[in-house]
Amino acid sequence: IKLVDGDVFQESNLNRQLMTSKANIGEVKTEVLKRRLLEVSDAKVDTINAYIDEYFKLKNYDYVVDCIDSLNSKFELVKKAHEKNIPIISSLGTARRLSCMNIKRTTLDKTQNDPLAKAFRTLVKKNNYRKKINVVYVDTPAIKSQKLGSSIFTVGSVGLFIASEVFNDLLKEC
């Protein structure tokens, strides 16, 4: 497993990222997750404490899971995975969703009710990118409240859904 993220945990992550706690605010996300993974498994876990940009070198992996907030970084990762023929799933918006009942896997061009997906489609079109982009999103309109961010049950459910999709895709190759 290769974990890539240049971010550190902030207090705003407490409501949606299960591996964060008040004790690890300010710690590098990849290192905290690596420690947690090694507590529960014998997996080989490597980390890169960096953001994805046009200079990022994507190696050959069995699968890539994109959970990036930045649209430019998300697009760079998708392009690099496609160039290397590595399957990739991009996670889209979960902010202000109070239901995890409508999690869907589709392609970017078929998403609805998701402002992040709409912005990502705009970026993809602007760059004249024509390949299909596999995504997972919540097909439920966000509530209007600006006070509510992302909820752990929605974010967690999307994460588990993606893990299931990746696992099943890899099983098909066996």
Positions of the model-derived regions?
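Adenine nucleotide-associated cytosolic modules
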Residues: 1-174
